[in-house]
Amino acid sequence: MSVYGLQRLYIGGAYVDATSGKTFDTFDPATGELLAQVQQASAADVDRAVASAQQGQREWAALTAMQRSRILRRAVDLLRERNDELAAIETRDTGKPIGETLAVDIVTGADVIEYYAGLATAIEGLQVPLRAESFVYTRREPLGVCAGIGAWNYPIQIACWKTAPALAAGNAMVFKPSEVTPLTALKLAEIYTEAGVPAGVFNVVQGDGSVGALLTGHPDIAKVSFTGGVETGKKVMSLAGASSLKEVTMELGGKSPLIVFDDADLDRAADIAVIANFFSSGQVCTNGTRVFVQRSIKDAFTAKVLERVKRIRVGKPTDADTNFGPLVSAAQLDKVLGFIASGKAEGAKLLAGGTRLTDGHFADGQYVAPTVFGDCRDDMKIVREEIFGPVMSILDFESEDEVIARANDTHYGLAAGVVTENLSRAHRTIHRLEAGICWINTWGESPAEMPVGGYKQSGVGRENGITTLEHYTRIKSVQVELGRYNPVF
């Protein structure tokens, strides 16, 4: 028996059975307990979801922007009312501590929907005068049916981030959550339906990458929004272009630099470094895993980091006191342990952690100790490649120019941060760093108002902020002639 039983697809405002006859299992990463059997969508199911979305989108787009805004605000209220219930499911599915999911995942997802509900009525065109008797006006119109493909680290938050601007602009969305954490997207679908979103406007199809490929290549989908790894992102972009030249926005991986200058408040810098590496057990795309510390303060900074690592409370995610849980899956655990072994083999100095935790109840879960390496070099695998786990690499530097060059020496460009009391140096450095999301004397917050996305191979386009509405609308230009028409022939 599983905890949540059989999970079906959500199409046309209701749960429906998949036609594939296939299911997959999802497990609690803290205990290994079977959470649910989940039905896998077939190609026919994807077609059914897209057709339902087309029908629902026409009804949704015909509403006024104010009507759509009111419905989305009702969804926000329902999300907040069900916060504790949804957080409990998210904790079981992802392994995140309950204190984290209660305070962050649903809360921030609801905030983004509320933000775009407020902007729905502000989507407008321009009027461009040409001459006394002629002008042009533009309309921002919805794209139609969009596809959202989510990652496993923030399941419901990502679903909210993708649906909020899409629905606010009058689109429909077919969403595929990660097969590793598939549960809460279905709850969001229930909430949208209860709030009054027309049937078909938000459909959920479950499955592995083959289902994502069906969505990406579907000729009746106008846009794909993807969150995940770089290599998968490249496949998404290629298939989207080859199928129908559909628009793509992607938030991909990172190997982000955190730069600590010698005038930094060391307590603040250590606090930032620890949260930038160990929040959500290090499974955050924007993690600042390359910690560059000016040489004169490296020892003092490292000591403060290690003090804080000792205070991390690793435990059962369902315990209120826990602030560090397991990794999301056995596969992710093996990957992280492989990186740790690589760091040791390449000569990095292990300062903390570096092992799987197996004592007591830890033996049933995918736990790895918070890990800190010192004496790291830029050419090490743990410094070059995204780990997506709780592994911090500390590197030292001498000069501002040196650290900027080294920080930019990567094909990633998602995030970056600077800790310094010198405001001029902070801005000067940030302006030279090749990253789309940057923080000065803080780390990690991504409010609804803030556009987020990467440079280089860390992504295309943005999520959140006003600019994201541009990715979910298309411009129609209309010329109006009020005067006499002058024929050419």
Curated annotation (Swiss-Prot):
Family: Belongs to the aldehyde dehydrogenase family.
Binding site for K(+) 2: 245, 456, 459
Enzyme active site: 162 (charge relay system), 251 (proton acceptor), 285 (nucleophile), 463 (charge relay system)
Gene that encodes it: betB
Binding-site list for K(+) 1: 26, 93, 180
Transmembrane parts of this sequence: none
Entry's EC annotation: 1.2.1.8
Residue numbers marked as site, Seems to be a necessary countercharge to the potassium cations: 247
Quaternary structure and interacting proteins, as annotated: Dimer of dimers.
Broadest EC class assigned to this enzyme: oxidoreductase
Protein name: Betaine aldehyde dehydrogenase
Record: residues binding NAD(+): 150-152, 176-179, 229-232, 253, 285, 386
This protein's UniProt keywords: Metal-binding, NAD, NADP, Oxidation, Oxidoreductase, Potassium
An annotated Gene Ontology molecular function: metal ion binding
Keyword set includes Disulfide bond: no
Cofactor binding note of this UniProt entry: Binds 2 potassium ions per subunit.
Organism from which the protein derives: Burkholderia vietnamiensis (strain G4 / LMG 22486)
Presence of the UniProt keyword Oxidoreductase in the record: yes
Modified residues (Cysteine sulfenic acid (-SOH)): 285
Job description of the protein: Involved in the biosynthesis of the osmoprotectant glycine betaine. Catalyzes the irreversible oxidation of betaine aldehyde to the corresponding acid.
Cofactor: K(+)
Higher taxonomy: Bacteria, Pseudomonadati, Pseudomonadota, Betaproteobacteria, Burkholderiales
InterPro entries with a match to the protein in the record: Ald_DH/histidinol_DH, Ald_DH_C, Ald_DH_CS_CYS, Ald_DH_CS_GLU, Ald_DH_N, Aldehyde_DH_dom, BADH
GO biological process, alphabetically ordered: glycine betaine biosynthetic process from choline
Catalytic activity: betaine aldehyde + NAD(+) + H2O = glycine betaine + NADH + 2 H(+)
